[in-house]
Amino acid sequence: MEFDSYIDWYNNLLTMPLNDVILGVKDTIEDKTVYLSLSDSKVIKMDNTSFVMGYY
């Protein structure tokens, strides 16, 4: 999937039936979980919600 902005990506992520979002690496991969690996990061805040977004 491609998104035009971080807001579009975040809003789409909220609609997915996910159990968890993992920033980093785990030994096992679980169903309905998003795993994100970040090389560098920046905290982005909006509407009383904040999350970390990575840049390559």
From Swiss-Prot:
Q: Does the keyword Transferase apply?
A: no
Q: What are the record keywords, sorted?
A: Viral capsid assembly, Viral genome ejection through host cell envelope, Viral long flexible tail ejection system, Viral penetration into host cytoplasm, Viral release from host cell, Virion, Virus entry into host cell
A single Gene Ontology CC annotation of this entry is: virion component
Q: Which domain of life is it from?
A: Viruses
Where is coiled-coil annotated? none
Localization: Virion
Q: What is its main location?
A: virion
Question: Which Gene Ontology biological process is one annotated for this entry?
Answer: symbiont genome ejection through host cell envelope, long flexible tail mechanism
Tell me which family the UniProt entry assigns to this protein.
Belongs to the skunalikevirus head completion protein 2 family.
Instruction: State its role.
Output: Probably functions as a stopper that is part of the head-tail connector and that locks the viral DNA in the capsid. During assembly, functions as a docking platform which the preassembled tail can bind to. Plays a role in morphogenesis of the virion capsid after genome packaging.
Record-given protein name = Probable head completion protein 2
